[in-house]
Amino acid sequence: PQLHMPSRRQRQMFIRDRSDSMHVATFQFQNSFIDETIDSIGFRIRGNTSRGSAKKSFKVDFNHFIRGRNFYNLEKLNLNGEHNDPSIVRSKLCWDFYQDIGMKSSRASHVTLYVNNEYFGLYLSVEHIDDTFISKNFDNDNGNLWKCIWPADLTFRGQYPEDYHPYYSETRPYDLKTNRDLYDYSKLARLIRIIHNTPDSLEAVLDIKTTLQYLAMNILTGSWDDYRFLRNNFYLYHNPDNDLIHWIPYDYDNTFGIDWFDID
């Protein structure tokens, strides 16, 4: 894709690379089938440790400034620089594996990125996990979706839902992404309570198949920045139709022998 924005805004974005503030930009996408331009999209730097890298990753938000708008059924798009992977194929292989086994996961493809006519490099375009993703992958999209990042260890903290609300000012281990007006953590609290008190009852609240697929895939790909090792990088979705929580994979740059300190 091509992104165009005022040069002053671009400089501000790179100076304040830890900010999640969206900047107005024009998005142009062209391939063998599509040649479209969208004005007034949101554009910002994204990521955690990757924000400190020379090759930044970016988030595109098609409806941030103009509500209700999407681009081929996508409201948001992650453009990942894969800064510590010289091959830029590790994450793509992981997402392809998940697609091959039929697990609900992000779609991904390689793209070239230009910002203000400057070539930024080869990137991996990864589908954002949000309410749009849920509506495409589940018959019932009215459930709660949690983004789980460090320290999302599923440790028992108490019997009440509010015990699992974000508990550090800078840390949100279980970040509710849908139905925020209700702020209901009861299904998450129920899952954690059963994990620690009556694990023989897990099948009644957790989709065991997708959980085992997730764990097996992380072992296969050598993913260590995950729930199993770092209590990090996964989503949980409660499906009201079957009253089960489903595991959704997330973030696969640290796989196949890659660590934080590799090539930038």
Give the ranges of each region predicted by the language model:
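Internal "kinase-insert"/substrate-recognition segments embedded within catalytic cores
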Residues: 59-67, 81-82, 101-106, 118-221
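Carboxylate/His-rich catalytic cores and anion/metal-binding grooves
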Residues: 35-42, 114-115, 136, 140-143, ...
